[in-house]
A protein has these predicted regions:
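Sequence-level preference for short, compositionally simple segments enriched
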Residues: 22-342
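Bacterial Sec-dependent N-terminal signal peptides
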Residues: 1-25
Length: 342
């Protein structure tokens, strides 16, 4: 009974906040600046998030000036339509060092940044977990739907990016990702377009957990896969759950990719349900002669389905309204010449 009352109160507060914005939206702030030197509205990113109005009527933009922001941040689900714009990807860094097993932390609470607000956009930001090779340690946990990351970096080791949300869709464009074991994992539909992906140890790049009935899981389009010099045994992926779906299309693959390409996670039954595909990859690791027999080589006709519109509509006959991901085709956000404290 008490729990029911609690959820009713939370709902009422959310509705009240939303109605308040409708009545007088001009009273709310839609542009914030965070700066370590005190020249912005806030010194800490989480303080700026906490000051944002929920369910805004217009996108909220958070400009983040160069600096190392040593903090664990969370953008809740009711903070929709938020944009994080960094001053420069190399110098705008959000970092923390939690990991699974540290105190009461699990894999899913070890993140540096958790993004749950739908229609989130990030540009020119580094998300890092500096815990080191100590087990699962997320740089990013994103379960927001229609989230776009452009020109960002994701630094970590095991489980760098958790692409969460069974029905969520996420797009990474021109990003840099690094890690060791299963460093891109989760159940969402996520596209990595023209990204650079670096494997730091003998490991598995992906561990998809695609939901039953979904046509697409992780899709890599025109990416470059790198491997450190000591890496000699690298798999494209293994199925975290039985219906994992992952495709590498027109990607550059390093010599470290094992001939079979894919791993069944020690369970032959996964070979009957997982969907692993490739098309016109290149490089020393792209030879498909000895690929796992249960993996798929796409045809020219089949690869036509691998467009953003089709992927993000789950192959539906009626294409997804692509306004949320087409924004990447427009000119990048411009850092304001003067960002003054308001």
């Amino acid at each position: 009974m008490i729990r029911c009352i609690f959820f009713v109160l939370v709902f009422c507060l959310s509705v009240t906040a939303s109605l308040g914005q409708t009545a007088n939206p001009q009273q709310y702030k839609y542009v914030f600046t965070v700066a370590k030197d005190g020249s912005g509205d806030y010194r800490y990113i989480q303080d700026a998030i906490d000051a944002m109005r929920v369910f805004p009527l217009a996108p909220i933009t958070l400009y983040i000036k160069n600096g190392v922001y040593n903090e664990k941040i969370e953008l809740p689900a009711n903070n929709t339509d938020v944009r994080f714009i960094g001053e420069s990807v190399e110098k705008t860094i959000i970092t923390f060092n939690d990991y699974s097993g540290r105190g009461k932390h699990t894999t899913f609470t070890s993140y540096t940044a958790k993004i749950s607000g739908n229609r989130f956009v990030a540009e020119n930001i580094t998300f890092a977990n500096t815990a080191g090779p100590v087990g699962q340690a997320l740089a990013l946990y994103v379960d927001a739907d229609k989230a776009v990351f452009t020109n960002c970096r994701f630094l970590g080791n095991q489980d760098t990016i958790y692409a969460a949300g069974e029905n969520a869709r996420q797009l990474f464009v021109n990003c840099y990702l690094e890690g060791t074991t299963d460093f891109i994992f989760g159940p969402s539909t996520a596209v990595f377009q023209q990204c650079t992906i670096r494997a730091k140890s003998n490991s598995y790049i992906t561990a998809a957990n695609t939901t039953t009935g979904k046509k697409f899981g992780f899709v890599f389009l025109d990416c470059t896969i790198l491997a450190d010099s000591a890496v000699t045994k690298l798999y494209l992926g293994r199925p975290w759950r039985a219906f994992a779906k992952t495709a590498f299309i027109r990607c550059q693959l390093p010599k470290a990719i094992v001939p079979e390409g894919w791993h069944n996670w020690g369970n032959p039954e996964n070979e009957k349900t997982a969907y692993y595909a490739e098309y016109q990859n290149r490089g020393e690791g792209a030879n498909t002669k000895y690929r796992a027999s249960w993996a798929k080589q796409l045809t020219a006709k089949e690869v036509k389905d691998y467009t953003l519109e089709t992927i993000f509509s789950n192959g539906a006959q009626v294409p997804e309204d692509g306004a949320w991901f087409r924004q990447i085709e427009r000119k990048s956000f411009q850092w304001p010449q003067e960002t003054k404290k308001q």
